[in-house]
Amino acid sequence: MDLNKLAEALVPDENVKPLEYYEKLYPERDLPKGAEVTRLAPSPTGFMHLGNLYVAIANERVAHQSGGVFYLRIEDTDEKRKVEGAVEVIHSSLKYFGITFDEGADLTGDYGPYYQRQRAEIYHAYARDLIRRGLAYPCFCTEEELEKTREHQTENKL
């Protein structure tokens, strides 16, 4: 199988740039040794839940105590469940609990965009590369088939 042809067929985006472009655009951060870069990536599907709040507190502390960076990226890929105004709720909820970001959604930063849907071109470039190298493969399952598989695995504790 010609993996280059497969990669082009699966990821035909003409806007995809070479990986070197993205590596130059997003160089390694100039941070102190031991500094951690952490993120919170909630989905704008309603109110913040305790799981997101817990992760936000832990990640903010780890990043800031290590001299690193804490950023907010919005996982806005689930259009079916997206709730209008949810991003604002996320911001106000985190602000209420005193959680601050160094960069991210609705803030400046050199490593954006910070909305998942706006990063598609980047993901396409890396997906294409993985397919070309034989490290990723396509799945043509329907949502129904995946759900059936998930149910089977859950029932059988697989």
Label each region the model flagged:
Residues D2-E155:
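N-terminal Rossmann-like or analogous alpha/beta NTP/dinucleotide-binding catalytic cores
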